Amino acid sequence: MSIRVKVCGITRVEDALAAVHLGANAVGFVFWEQSARYISPAEARGIVSTLPPFVTSVGVYVDPEAGWVDESISVAGLNLLQFHGSESPEFCQQFSLPYIKAVRVRPGLDLLQYASLYTGATGLLLDTYVEGEPGGTGEAFDWNLIPRNLPLPLILSGGLHAGNVTSAIQQAHPWAVDVSSGVEAAKGIKDSGKIAAFMRGVGISESL
């Protein structure tokens, strides 16, 4: 099975095109204004319009107002929504696009129970828990906390980079991996060399 790759926190058209050229299946745009990787829906639209076919454009939100989600869907031309806060299942499924639900993993959290609440999601994204930081922390979590029988496709995130993505895939067996800080030169500025190295790491995992 080919592991899908999403490069998140895109703010520049050249970074999006580099990611896609190097093999990424999806690019993520952070519509949370407190993030250093924030981009406006209009700016995201300018990037989305340059992408080739069959590349998924993902809008990332943290406890947004419904109107903001609707506006960004309309303006940016998204394909998929990613909710990274404490949004309820009812909130997530009210929109015109499919969604994935992110959860920050820590000991004691029942991931099977959590996943059972979001049966309408197309995937469950597992990220690292850091107090006050919804994502993009650059820190990995203990992959041993991931149950083998998650009922939703697993998207692995949290501190992934070229040096650990092969072992992460071997251990967690995800449907997809999501990377942001691990391929950056600075927050919101991607490094094509790091993206290329990350993609090689994904490729190695598929050959083992």
Swiss-Prot record:
E.C. number(s) listed in UniProt: 5.3.1.24
UniProt xrefs under Pfam families: PRAI
**What are the GO MF terms of this UniProt record?**
phosphoribosylanthranilate isomerase activity
**InterPro entries assigned to the protein according to its UniProt record, in alphabetical order:** Aldolase_TIM (IPR013785), PRAI_dom (IPR001240), RibuloseP-bd_barrel (IPR011060), TrpF_fam (IPR044643)
| Highest taxon, organism lineage | Bacteria
Pathway assignment reads:
Amino-acid biosynthesis; L-tryptophan biosynthesis; L-tryptophan from chorismate: step 3/5
User: What family, per the record?
Assistant: Belongs to the TrpF family.
Matching NCBIfam families: PRK01222.1-4, PRK01222.1-6
What is the recorded name of this protein? N-(5'-phosphoribosyl)anthranilate isomerase
Give the species this sequence originates from.
Nitrosospira multiformis (strain ATCC 25196 / NCIMB 11849 / C 71)
